[in-house]
Amino acid sequence: MTASSPSLSPTLELACELIRRPSVTPLDADCQALMMRRLEAAGFALEPMRIEEVDNFWARRGGDGPVLCFAGHTDVVPTGPLQAWQHQPFDALIDDQGMLCGRGAADMKGSLASMIVAVERFVADHPKHKGAIAFLITSDEEGPAHHGTKAVVERLAARGERLDWCIVGEPSSTSLVGDVVKNGRRGSLGAKLTIRGVQGHVAYPHLAKNPIHLAAPALAELAAEHWDDGNAFFPPTSFQVSNLNSGTGATNVIPGELTALFNFRFSTESTVEGLQKRVEAILDKHGLDWHVEWALSGLPFLTEPGELLDAVAASIRAVTGREARPSTSGGTSDGRFIATMGTQVVELGPVNATIHQVNERVLASDLELLTEIYYQTLVRLLA
């Protein structure tokens, strides 16, 4: 079945139109123009925000009262080797198993289509709804994420924009649509560590200082350290070394320097400052000549049970009969930026089994369920 098939539902038709636009990050490939046309027709005021090379937009419909925002991204990751795909990644085909195939089908153009169609239907059914509905869309989520949601949120906060609730369309489900929702994320703190030694000949180790030998005990202690116990919402903080580089490429030269990249995924039981101090104390304990450059990608955030989480859970239950399991596992998302506005944030999207993979796909019928879940959530919060 192709994207032009007359038998496609409004959600699948729009999802296919979006997938057929090759919006490899940070490109948008006119996905947002398509979405904005639909939202403008539904009575939204539009505010495109191009920041550096990134396309973003903010759209809002309604008056005073609580604001429910739908957030997401139009950019996708690169395809990988085209010959490995069963169907071309931007053809947007539905196979004989009922799977919508294509880059972005799960992450996250399927969610975007479900959001738009759900909102169109809600506005038609409830033209005088309470509060306001908003959209915050970027083309810089899969890339550096400097000029996307983060920058838009800064502008919105500076002018006092209100955001009470936000649904981010990230693919949160694991096996069945709606089985898991993300009600928070761990923080991410990365670092580049440099250990300085003295280069020399391997036959004369007394004239050199081997930074590999010097660093090994400290790295082992960092890897074994118990950082915290986590809590009811978050697992314990984890520390992982992701890169280790040293040496000249020669077997007879003791290197003069070692660099290590490492990352913390941390819970609300730890702070950035606390983790940094503990790392630096361990490095000092081992008498190392060290330098570290820290990079904070995001702080942990948590949406506890309340209006948004209750409405989402009730909608999933009504549509699928499932009890959604709240989770804070996985990587970071743009929800970390939106949460800084004091917003209740929940991530809800399709099954994530094939995201970023060759042959990315999502069950077409799941997008219909997702559309209905979004619609029912709108009804519960704003009808």
From Swiss-Prot:
Zn(2+) 1 binds at H73, D107, E170. GO terms for biological process: diaminopimelate biosynthetic process; L-arginine biosynthetic process; lysine biosynthetic process via diaminopimelate. Keywords: Amino-acid biosynthesis, Cobalt, Diaminopimelate biosynthesis, Hydrolase, Lysine biosynthesis, Metal-binding, Zinc. Binds 2 Zn(2+) or Co(2+) ions per subunit. The keyword Electron transport does not apply. Pathway: Amino-acid biosynthesis; L-lysine biosynthesis via DAP pathway; LL-2,6-diaminopimelate from (S)-tetrahydrodipicolinate (succinylase route): step 3/3. Belongs to the peptidase M20A family. DapE subfamily. PANTHER family: ACETYLORNITHINE DEACETYLASE (PTHR43808), N-ACETYL-L-CITRULLINE DEACETYLASE (PTHR43808:SF31). This is Succinyl-diaminopimelate desuccinylase. The lineage of its organism: Bacteria, Pseudomonadati, Pseudomonadota, Gammaproteobacteria, Pseudomonadales.
